[in-house]
Regions:
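P/S/T/G-enriched low-complexity
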Residues: 26-408
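Bacterial N-terminal signal peptides that target proteins for export
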Residues: 2-14
């Protein structure tokens, strides 16, 4: 996977197992504990997962501002240096996992490795259009369409025909007019590089499983969650098409039966079924998604009850919210929950995601239960007041929601 999505996968793993998320977006130096006490001892925690299914997730470029008509006709569009979604020859892309129920047991295997001469445009859908990348490769454009023009001065003579060419990328070379920071989009900074024999499989995996924001996110989440312990209680949702804890009765519905329960057996299979079919349509209503997660913990009795009906006041709850960009469809009203806090948490802006994240952390979501959630203090100085304010710690013992937000 690309460097960006390698980080996302690591972050998802860290969030899912209750470890500290890496502070720097491209730092991979921190080791992630695979068996934290929060998951191996005591009551199983709740893990709520919300993924972005907005229309922009179908795009094959990042950041958003790249998609100008000028850039689409330049070499830079086909270089990972300029367009971070494009193929990176320095990364080994991994095929995600298929998780199925076979004879009553969960079986995990790799998805089929795509063929360089017959690669599906969507590796999760075996019926999607197949492309011979050795001769018919086209880069994806500003939306879901593929580029049908060769541009001016982009390719060597005779290589491209109506946008079709052998699979390739363009290598950025740093020089006086081609700076290392804020890379130039000028064609002269990039060198055409066809995909050689040793990179054909790697390119095909990128094309089928990582080419777009949605494909890459699904693959990163797939690889992050397939080893998640069974004693985590999981429910999932999307911004537009599936609500946290909706609990549809059919394992083949929009949510693939996402009733919160331990991440085992058919429930584990249901999650990966849903993940592989995540759609790409609509806006980015992040506030509503966070509110749905918090309200689920506040109002649904299943959030604190095991399947045998036992209810636990010490159960911790975590929410992972992933998105590719800025929110829209903001709720009405003027809410500034963090406006009364000390800096650096205080701000004067109302209706931000931080307001809702603070609200569902500070509010006792189940006042009828005793406050028995175990506080988290990995960093202590001996000064109790300061330790409680340290953002690396969590002093809350009431039922609350801890948010991990992942942005592209």
């Amino acid at each position: 996977m690309t460097a960006n999505y390698s980080d996302i996968a690591r972050t998802l793993i860290a969030a899912a197992i209750g470890s500290t998320i890496l502070s720097a977006p491209l730092s991979l130096s921190a080791a992630v504990s695979q068996q934290p006490l929060s998951l191996t001892e005591g009551v199983a925690p709740n893990l709520l997962v919300t993924l972005d299914d907005s229309g922009s997730m179908a795009w094959a470029y990042a950041p958003d501002g790249l998609a100008t008509s000028e850039n689409l006709g330049r070499r830079a569009w086909r270089s990972n240096t300029f367009n971070s979604m494009y193929y990176d020859p320095n990364i080994v892309y991994r095929v995600p996992k298929q998780v199925k129920m076979v004879n009553g047991e969960v079986v995990v295997t790799d998805y089929p490795t795509p063929s360089f001469t017959n690669a599906p445009q969507n590796g999760y859908n075996s019926t999607s259009t197949k492309v011979n990348l050795s001769t018919k490769y086209r880069a994806q454009g500003s939306g879901t369409d593929f580029i049908t023009s060769c541009g001016t001065g982009v390719f060597p003579t005779g290589v491209c025909n109506s946008g079709e060419a052998p699979a390739h990328y363009f290598q950025y070379t740093v020089s006086g007019t081609c700076p290392q920071t804020n890379p130039s989009s000028a064609n002269s900074c990039y060198t055409y590089t066809p995909i050689g024999t040793t990179q054909q499989t790697n390119f095909a995996i990128w094309y089928s499983f990582y080419r777009t924001r949605s494909l890459a996110t699904r693959s990163a989440a797939n690889l992050a969650f397939y080893t998640l312990p069974e004693n985590v209680r999981l429910t999932w949702g999307a911004l537009n098409t599936c609500n946290i804890g909706a609990g549809s009765t059919s394992s083949s519905g929009t949510c693939s039966n996402n009733t919160i329960k331990r991440f085992s057996d058919q429930h584990r299979v249901n999650f990966f079924t849903w993940l592989g079919a995540l759609p790409e349509s609509g806006g980015t209503p992040l506030h509503n998604a966070m509110k749905r997660a918090g309200n689920f913990l506040m109002t649904d009795s299943k959030a604190y009850k095991d399947e045998d009906g036992s209810e636990y006041a010490c159960r911790a709850s975590y929410h992972i919210l992933m998105t590719d960009g800025m929110w829209n469809n903001q709720p009405s009203g003027s809410i500034n929950y963090d406006g009364s806090l000390d800096y650096p948490y205080k701000d004067e802006q109302a209706n931000t995601l931080a307001d809702w994240a603070y609200h569902y952390w500070a509010t006792d979501l189940r006042p009828n239960l005793a406050n028995r959630v175990k506080p988290y203090f990995p960093f202590e100085t001996g000064n109790s007041a300061n330790d409680k304010k340290d953002p690396r710690n969590n002093p809350a013992d009431w039922q609350h929601m801890v948010n991990f937000t992942v942005g592209l």
